[in-house]
UniProtKB/Swiss-Prot annotation:
A GO term from the CC aspect: cytoplasm
Protein species of origin: Mycobacterium tuberculosis (strain ATCC 25618 / H37Rv)
Functional note: Confers DNA tethering and processivity to DNA polymerases and other proteins. Acts as a clamp, forming a ring around DNA (a reaction catalyzed by the clamp-loading complex) which diffuses in an ATP-independent manner freely and bidirectionally along dsDNA. Initially characterized for its ability to contact the catalytic subunit of DNA polymerase III (Pol III), a complex, multichain enzyme responsible for most of the replicative synthesis in bacteria; Pol III exhibits 3'-5' exonuclease proofreading activity.
Protein's UniProt name: Beta sliding clamp
Family, per entry: Belongs to the beta sliding clamp family.
InterPro entries according to UniProt: DNA_clamp_sf (IPR046938), DNA_polIII_beta (IPR001001), DNA_polIII_beta_C (IPR022635), DNA_polIII_beta_cen (IPR022637), DNA_polIII_beta_N (IPR022634)
Amino acid sequence: MDAATTRVGLTDLTFRLLRESFADAVSWVAKNLPARPAVPVLSGVLLTGSDNGLTISGFDYEVSAEAQVGAEIVSPGSVLVSGRLLSDITRALPNKPVDVHVEGNRVALTCGNARFSLPTMPVEDYPTLPTLPEETGLLPAELFAEAISQVAIAAGRDDTLPMLTGIRVEILGETVVLAATDRFRLAVRELKWSASSPDIEAAVLVPAKTLAEAAKAGIGGSDVRLSLGTGPGVGKDGLLGISGNGKRSTTRLLDAEFPKFRQLLPTEHTAVATMDVAELIEAIKLVALVADRGAQVRMEFADGSVRLSAGADDVGRAEEDLVVDYAGEPLTIAFNPTYLTDGLSSLRSERVSFGFTTAGKPALLRPVSGDDRPVAGLNGNGPFPAVSTDYVYLLMPVRLPG
């Protein structure tokens, strides 16, 4: 599905297709187009009609996206038009068939009684999209979207620290581990997939923004295929390919060293607590109303209860008490409310388990499963061994006043 190989008849492309499928494909490709492209043609989407249907492509030298759409190709060819403009137009069109025809250096688009005439850009100046590396493995689309969203939330956004803007992807046979950190929190997700080879082994760093967009926009279909190569050449192309359901994208890998994260995960806790996620999120939002942006929310844990509080005398104070299953000595700890709610929302669980060491060390959040031993059944005041789970969110506390 390489659009570059089918650029023929550059001035006579004519096709008809359904508005919904056209709008979906154009929008998906246009999402990754640069707002300020280095050269004008990179703001365009390439429409290529052939015997295989319509191919819609976008590329900015870092990220490529390509979607195959069923269409009635009256006359094959290619045309390059503004991606943002075409996306806006196709999403606003009535739900009727769309006719597209290239007329000289303009493209005519008709849908119902609506007609548009758009300028084109030189197809010959458009770069060739990269070829996908060999397929490395596949996993269900829903699992891919969930896992990426769970770890991308913890990735950094400071481009001066590229090692923190990526998601580390570790592959060991049928097991994949995803990890991301911005130094204030760390998210790790482990999952199983169908590897192309049982002995495949690789570790790469992928831009979190690109993976998050891919997960959010969705490839669709039942499976997502990841392509990094096979054998000893895994990751050597410097590209990750993601494909499925007629869509494919590539992104350049980050050439940076991800922090050694496993040594940060505690193996035991001095105190543990479990509580309702939705109830806790609502309480955090409530008390944080009197906290300055990014200010702390304090949590005072004792047997059977936790008190959330925020604010100060000059801006106002707020507190709320919640029921909690707690084991360990009484503990007061504070967190950034945004980072805390991010972690709670990413658990995909009705209840959360907190594992604590001290008020000055990171807390470990994990989803509570039906196999969990009740906190009330734990003896003594610790230490309590960390429970193995497929997702953890490690969060640095905020220094308490005084």
